[in-house]
Amino acid sequence: LGRRLEWPDNYFTLTNSVSYLNYSLQDWNSGLGFSNGNANSFTFNTTLARRSLDQIMYPSSGSDISLSVTLTPPFSRFRNLDYATATPAERFKWIEYHKWMFDAKYYLPLDSKKKLVLEAKAHFGFIGSYSTEAGVGPFERFYLGGDGLAGGFNAFLLGQEIIGLRGYENNQITPPDYANFGRSNNG
């Protein structure tokens, strides 16, 4: 559901969506920490955006700015589960996280015919958990490093966002405690 806002100007939009995903894993071997079981993701997303591009396909002036928030219910608050002793399949039966994304693009024509254009852009993201015991699960994560294309089919299936970074091998800047799914190694 979305609508164009009239304040502060006509370039603003607000969109909302609700989503449910079921990850049914059977003999899945891709570093998730479990290979059999079901994980459920129920999310609410809202996006506030401002788009003032002169053209959608090949913009030569204007800007495109958005802030998006994706939230799941804090299932760890409702479930009676000891996360310290639970298996990964039990921990991630109901996936929980909050994910924030900010994107900005600005197009500036460098000549009068708008044939030469400077594009400045920024892309920020943050994912967090509601509980330090539950941590962030293996789904909907950010992977940094490499060409930005290496995730392939697994990245699509698991909702992973791959962020390319030249000078590094694929997935080489992923935190070393990834196997703990966001939990601290300090005990």
Question: Where do the protein language model's features map onto the residues?
Answer:
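Transmembrane beta-barrel wall of Gram-negative outer-membrane proteins
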Residues: 1-34
